[in-house]
Amino acid sequence: MGLRLSEEKTKIVHIDEGFDFLGMHIQRHKKLGADRRFVYTYPSRAALAAVKAKVRTACRGTTNQSLSDLLKRLNPILRGWTNYHRHGAASKTFSYLTAFTWRRVWIWLRGKHPKATVKELRRRYLPGWHPQQDEVRMFYPDTVAIVRYRYRGAAIASPWATKDTAA
C-alpha cells in the first residue's frame, strides 16, 4: 500500500501564480503600501460561478410562488456559502454576490408583476430597497464579518490558565 501521485490530478505551480483548493484560490501578492508579500485566500471563480448558478436556478420559473418562498430558498444558499468563505479575503466577492442576488430578485419581481411600476413594486416588496415579505428578509452576504485566525506563535495558550499563572 504505497502512495502514488497521479500526473493528471497533480499540478505543481509557483505560489505567485496561485492555485485553487477546496473552493479557495490561494495566491501570494504584494500588499498595497508595503514591500512585503503575503499569501491571500480568495473564493475561487468556480465556487462563485457555482453559487451564482444556484441563485439563478432558485429564481428561474418560480413566479407563481410568493417572494417569501423565494427568499426562504435563497437565504440558506447564501448563508452557507458565505460562512464557508468568510475566512479568506472575500469582502469584494461578498459585495458582488449581494448585488448579483439583489438583481436576480428584482428580475424575478418584474417577471411576477410585469405591469407593475417600480414605485408599486418598491412599496409592496422593497421597503428601504431591502426585499422582504411576511417577516422574511433577503440575506445580504456583504454583512458577514470576515474572520481570520491570527498566528499565536509556538506557545498554545492553556485553557486552565488563571490570572496568577498567565503572567
Name each region found by the language model:
Residues 1-167:
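Non-catalytic terminal/accessory segments
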